Curated annotation (Swiss-Prot):
Ranges that cross the membrane: 20-42, 52-74
Organism of derivation: Homo sapiens
Gene that this polypeptide is encoded by: MPC1L
Protein name per its UniProtKB record: Mitochondrial pyruvate carrier 1-like protein
Broad class of where this protein is predominantly found: mitochondrion
Pfam families, per the entry: MPC
GO biological process: mitochondrial pyruvate transmembrane transport
Keyword tRNA-binding found: no
Localization per Swiss-Prot or TrEMBL: Mitochondrion inner membrane
Gene Ontology terms for molecular function: pyruvate transmembrane transporter activity
Length: 136
């Protein structure tokens, strides 16, 4: 229990230090904090249909994050929080790109169309509709 109290005091002292306050009020903190929206949105969209994925935008986001991942590492002082954000975004967008490729070029779209009946057949068999009259 004494170790926990010591750890708690160290954390509290660190959070109250001038260096921590300066870090939290800098762009090295807030830039990555807001940039986490990109990978979080990509992770959220992984459950959505692959029809909504834009191949061009996904490619652009992969290249953008790869370039800025290198920038975050090379800038002085190194911004490892931003680098982690861009690394996560590259991985998330790569998953989205693979879903896009499988759907449009791997036959996933054709299978989805084969499963769904055409709209005219669905309308004809909808409840409350009358069967077509036969010619006599």
């Amino acid at each position: 229990m004494a170790r926990m109290a010591v750890l708690w005091r160290k954390m509290r002292d660190n959070f109250q230090s001038k260096e921590f306050r300066e870090y939290v009020s800098s762009t090295h903190f807030w830039g990555p904090a807001f940039s986490w929206g990109l990978p979080l949105a990509a992770f959220k969209d992984m459950k959505a249909s692959p029809e909504i994925i834009s191949g061009r935008m996904t490619t652009a986001l992969i290249l953008y994050s790869a370039i800025f991942m290198r920038f975050a590492y090379r800038v002085q002082p190194r911004n490892l929080l931003l680098m982690a954000c861009h690394c996560t975004n590259v991985m998330a967008q790569s998953v989205q790109a693979s879903r896009y490729l499988l759907y449009y070029y791997g036959g996933g779209g054709a299978e989805a169309k084969a499963r769904d009946p055409p709209a005219t057949a669905a309308a004809a068999t909808s409840p409350g509709s009358q069967p077509p009259k036969q010619a006599s």
